[in-house]
């Protein structure tokens, strides 16, 4: 029964993206517009041996570009990117369903997932945006944290969950860092709960496991760019440039006010 639900959700996600993700959908062969076209251009360039951030520049994280590159490696066209989108959204929908099942029965949970994904149509734009990939890395911590709170509220937060939160946060950070803020909120609530309960040791271990999770994802990425000789370029584009961009935007708003 669970397998049937997962297959249905996967097919629904494929149909949704085929209609809504105009930049990558096989139904829109010649469509090219928006941020997605930039991401695919850089992804295609990577698949042809070019270096992101030095040969081509954009201020998104490397995971986004290498997912696009993987799509072009797979098929040589944007169809590969569409396939990767389908995988990510399908997995996201499954974790949405698993989360909903904590509170509702099967049919109601499926409806919740469908409504949520349909609501995503208002922000998907032309598809293949950073949020689309980060949703999976956000849904995993949401599911795990809610599962723990509802199933085992009186037990310490599992350390392996905190490690997973760290990995997911790093994944979001290396796509678009502000997309991972929600995960930071989950960790913060967990730590506040530990301090209120006077479980200082638990709080320390939770922080440690979260940091280890971040390092588990961040270190291989940084080593990869270090070997390529473009680590400083990647850090500047992914983090420094965006902090500068956000700071300048805030300054302009304040001066305008």
Which residues make up each language-model segment?
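Transmembrane-helix motifs of polytopic, lipid-linked glycan transferases
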Residues: 83-103, 140-144
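Transmembrane-helix signature of polytopic, membrane-embedded enzymes
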Residues: 96-118, 135-136, 153-160
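Membrane-interface transmembrane helices that cradle and orient dolichyl/undecaprenyl
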Residues: 141-164, 196-198
């Amino acid at each position: 029964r669970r397998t049937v639900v997962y297959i249905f959700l996967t097919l629904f996600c494929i149909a949704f993206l085929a209609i809504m993700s105009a930049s990558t959908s096989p139904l829109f062969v010649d469509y090219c517009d928006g941020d997605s076209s930039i991401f695919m251009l850089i992804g295609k360039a990577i698949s042809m041996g070019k270096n992101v951030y030095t040969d081509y520049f954009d201020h998104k994280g490397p995971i986004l570009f290498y997912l696009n590159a993987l799509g072009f490696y797979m098929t040589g066209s944007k169809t590969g990117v569409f396939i990767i989108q389908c995988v990510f959204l399908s997995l996201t929908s499954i974790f949405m369903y698993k989360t909903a099942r904590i509170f509702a029965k099967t049919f109601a949970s499926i409806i919740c997932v469908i409504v949520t994904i349909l609501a995503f149509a208002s922000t998907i734009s032309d598809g293949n945006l950073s949020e689309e990939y980060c949703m999976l890395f956000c849904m995993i911590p949401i599911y795990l944290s809610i599962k723990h709170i509802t199933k085992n509220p009186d037990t310490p937060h599992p350390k392996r969950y905190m490690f997973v939160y760290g990995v997911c946060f790093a994944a979001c950070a290396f796509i678009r860092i502000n997309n991972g803020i929600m995960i930071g909120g989950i960790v913060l609530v967990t730590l506040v709960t530990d301090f209120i309960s006077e479980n200082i040791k638990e709080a320390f271990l939770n922080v440690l496991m979260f940091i280890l999770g971040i390092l588990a994802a961040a270190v291989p990425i940084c080593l990869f760019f270090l070997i390529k000789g473009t680590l400083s370029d990647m850090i500047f584009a992914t983090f420094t440039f965006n902090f500068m961009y956000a700071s300048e935007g805030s300054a302009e708003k304040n001066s305008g006010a």
